[in-house]
Amino acid sequence: RKKISTDTLEKIIYAISNASTYDEIRDIIKNAKIYESQKVILIKVLRANSLSDDARHTLAKKLVEAEENRFGKKIERTDIVTRIGPTLGLMGTLIPMGPGLAALGVGDVNTLASAIIVAFDTTVVGVGSGAVAYFVSKVRRRWYEEYLSDLDALVDTVLDKLKN
């Protein structure tokens, strides 16, 4: 992941705003130090210069929404692990406890001990996987929000330039 600094974003916005031709804007976008996927979306918006302002704005909005949906699907995976991991850990705790308690009833302490070991191991794995997935989701969500914020600013700049 590469981080786009505010200074870099500002330079790109000024360059697009001060560009005088379609080709100049396209070259600025192609040479910008931004993600390739952002360049693709910006070029699509730029190519829509023959559309009305409203149609171009609608297209840009749909392109950004599609990008948001793409990132949402990626985050869903780790969000699912965040919730399922601890649930499976709890199930792994409760399931071996039944035979362990039954073994305790007949005086078999060794079976109880091994059941408790399995129960606690699965609890730790479940909670651990949930914690790792939660951390990954939070970091990814922040990255994607920055990406989309940058994309939104750049799309607005291109739309504004095409309007003038």
PLM region spans:
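Hydrophobic membrane-targeting segments
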Residues: 1-8
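Helix-termination/interfacial motifs at the ends of transmembrane alpha-helices
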Residues: 74-128
